[in-house]
Amino acid sequence: MAIENYIPDFAVEAVYDLTVPSLQAQGIKAVLVDLDNTLIAWNNPDGTPEMKQWLHDLRDAGIGIIVVSNNTKKRVQRAVEKFGIDYVYWALKPFTFGIDRAMKEFHYDKKEVVMVGDQLMTDIRAAHRAGIRSILVKPLVQHDSIKTQINRTSERRVMRKITEKYGPITYKKGI
């Protein structure tokens, strides 16, 4: 396990800190975003006014938003359909299946997309494997679902190794 495969290109406080100008400056035409604890809190499917404004801003600028989630179709569809967001379910992160599917289905090149998520073990690792840029965000809520709690245990070990070798990951207010 090469620790470098878990280091994000950027780390920001929240997905909503990714502004249109900063994404455009990086040549980003689409944001692939994890669902639970990245776009919305896993236990609050309604989203926040801040999230709704962020979606509106990106859409107005012509930046695509595609949820790439390991969840079932039912879970993802129920969470995002009210927001009109495209999605890929059963993404199988940390493998590239969902990212590859999103880029092919929505006609994006690797240089034009970024994967945003709250987990090194799934979101960031999948982005590395797919050859796209990655952005790590802090989880929206500190309490995770049972499945995610298991990943967080491994993630803490990886984070310690990253910190020992490269120093701590520093979260900023934007890219």
Predicted regions: what they are:
Residues 2-33, 44-45, 49-175:
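Asp-based, Mg2+/Mn2+-dependent phosphohydrolase catalytic module
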